[in-house]
Amino acid sequence: DELRDELEGADMVFVTCGLGGGTGTGSAPIIAKLAKKAGALTVAVATMPFSAEGIRRRENAENGLEKLKSAADTVIIIPNDKLLEVAPNLPLNKAFMVSDEILGRAVKGITELITKSGLVSLDFADIKSIMGSSGMAMIGMGESDSGDRALESVHEALSSPLLDIDISNATGALINIAGSSDMTLHESEKIVQVVADKLDPEANIIWGAQIDESLENTIRTTIVVSGISESKDSNSITDDDFEDSQETTSNEDQLDDFIDGIF
């Protein structure tokens, strides 16, 4: 009853958890169901366990995911094993910390589209149009401070190991573009166009651009792709996304840079 009272009147509720254990796997679907029943847009952000955590934990996570999908409007999945695929020498304790940081950035990337004013601001209705009853979703993140930072940041986000799926049939995408005050509207529009070219022409794309002076000369792109199929096909990113020929940065280098920024 106390939890129900806390959720009453909320417009949007994030339920974050690590699936596979007892606490998150058992409680997250219940909380999500209560939040949705209270009328809130309910978005779950869940990590799937590392293979090193064992088969039983993996099976528990899959069962919990099915319950979570039926309870929440949208479930954003963060597959922990993808971190180790591209950085197999990453210590497991650091991998858990990176996974938690990604989960936090996923929530922050969505909420800042509403809460922070910027070049292009969104409201709750915009978020709901993408996240409401959209099923499965995944997230990609990228950033760059190069001379072609806009295209490089979106390329990195789309080729992120966390977004290792075919997004061509996704029903929607939420794009958060952040940069310092020298970021231009033209750069933001280039990022959105690259994402649009990867999706179905009928997909609903909502984007916002925020000013964050702590990023200095860097542009950070966060993409949440919703309404995806559950196939495991890789999302192919080609060099045609760049106006000029660019040397592709390996996923391992991208992850190393990301980890360096966290620790």
Q: How would you describe each model-predicted region?
A:
Residues 1-263:
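Tubulin/FtsZ superfamily GTPase core signature
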